[in-house]
Amino acid sequence: MGQKAVTSQIVLTGTQTLWRADGGREAANPHPTAISFYTGTGYAFDPTIPIRFNSFAGLLLQAPDQGRPLDSYGIKINWQRLNDNYTRFLADANLISGGSGAPFSRDKFVFEVNAHFALPGGVALEPVVQYLVNGNSFYNPYTARRPKDGFYGGFTLSVPLGTLLGLAPG
């Protein structure tokens, strides 16, 4: 008989519209100018999971210009807590890679501003600027370099190939 590995976690998310420019009177408008609050949290009950806890909250301004109803602007705060054993592993991996081996903070914070710009054909450009506090080497554990607090900028370009090639409805 083989072993069966099971992990358990809980994830909760929610969104609440705080304000609509039309006061909710324009029911036929599928994209009203609105401000929404969103949040989510997750907890891993299994102590072997590297990310033990993650929680975020943000505000989203949707359809700020009715001429571009699919655009949005947002701000978000994210808090992530690593498992204590995993932070020790990261420090040990840093040491054997020639780094200081100093302990990493279990808590990481990200402060973010973001946007979503809808382009023709269902394509979307999503720029983001983040400020990172207490970064760790989660994605590159065997490095001698230590991450520093600071800014990050980037973007995602979403291209719906199926739609553009006519394989999926637009």
Predicted regions span which residues?
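Outer-membrane beta-barrel translocator domains and adjoining extracellular loop/strand segments
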Residues: 1, 26, 49-53, 85-92, ...
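A conserved active-site cap/scaffold subdomain adjacent to cofactor or substrate pockets
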Residues: 1-25
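Residues on the lipid-exposed face of transmembrane beta-strands in outer-membrane beta-barrel proteins
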Residues: 12-16, 57-61, 75, 113-119, ...
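Transmembrane beta-strands of outer-membrane beta-barrel pores
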Residues: 18, 41-47, 61, 77-83, ...
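Transmembrane beta-barrel strands of outer-membrane/channel proteins
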Residues: 35-43, 55-57, 73-81, 91, ...
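Outer-membrane beta-barrel "beta-signal"
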Residues: 75, 147-170
